[in-house]
């Protein structure tokens, strides 16, 4: 069944049909298409545009189509001759309920229909991704709560910098993924206006009640410009941008896990169930899942750039180029959902080697800043203290020892301000625990933050 053809004298070339059809991929939102159609005919009947009997017959037919598609009793084949999911649903409906099915499209264009379907689908997927992000945040919070006193080195430039805790490190990613949830929420708020009733681009002469249709579909209200309604893909660009940032956060985290999982670091061990082996090297246990998640970020970025490039030269209103949005959005959404699901499972099954982390934190002079602060607290200007401790570090490097092991007399040779209590000041636990400002790794600060995170997840 075609939704057009009266003014044509030739059949569509098969290659043209194959190139033009979208049923092979837009069948993904058949539920949203049916939901939108049910709302549309409900409004049409309320406005007296359709008879009550036509409404009943159409809704009965649409519900039977969804039931059969859900159960597998009805399948969608790209070879069926239908151009897209809209024509498939309308054609199948007409086969089932007869003449009434031909009235389904009254007061509607595929342009506003597909805009609605994509918004409904995007809204549903945002809800699902929000749940996946929440699951990940719950797992990160559990790791934080269990590791308030698991010391590890913090890094800058991949060089050891200062001692922190595993809880503090996980908290950084908690913040990132919390922002990701917030971005998805913002997108949903901005896009939650109903385009149905905009027609092809100029509305319709039928007395539609667009506000009623919007209410039936849980939108805040109707969109206010019919041309923008059918030509707008900003919400998809925003979504792809947000998904790209999620993918970037996952990629950064995976990069750290890959590094931590090496024999050189040994901070973590990825569970066997989330690892793979080598076809030639029997000893290998590879972090393939982390590497794949890291790699798939480029795929998501590509979708964003592709859609931006598609949209940049399009005049108003609808253009067929916009059909390209679906495969890009579908793939990016599925990719990020899969990555979130796998990443959460990988984190939940991962072993954190606390003893290795703590031993590493004791090396590399991570307490040097605290030695400088010790001097500052005794009246030495920070810039002078910085230079003094730099000399201490150089002395320790020459002797192959840590600051903790340098004799007091050698401290005092460089600065007489040092006293016996310097060793307590630069002890790793002291270095971490005295950092109590908001956002710092000390237990007092971390407990307050964790309480806020827990409250955030319970809302």
List the model feature ranges, each with a label:
Residues 1-203, 208-215, 221, 276-277, ...:
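A helix-coil-helix interface module used to build multimeric assemblies
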Residues 1-36, 99-100, 281-459:
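Glycine-rich cofactor/substrate-binding loops
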Residues 37, 65, 72, 129, ...:
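Amphipathic alpha-helices that form helix-helix packing interfaces
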Residues 42-50, 165-168, 237-245, 370-379:
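Short, well-ordered beta-strand elements within core beta-sheets of diverse protein domains
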Residues 50, 74, 265-266, 381, ...:
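Conserved hydrophobic residue
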Residues 132, 158, 162-172, 176, ...:
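Short, contiguous, pocket-lining structural segments
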Residues 146, 183-186, 190, 219-223, ...:
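Conserved helix-loop functional segments at active or binding sites
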Residues 217-309:
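Acidic, glycine-rich loop-and-beta core segments that form the ion-binding/anion-interacting portion
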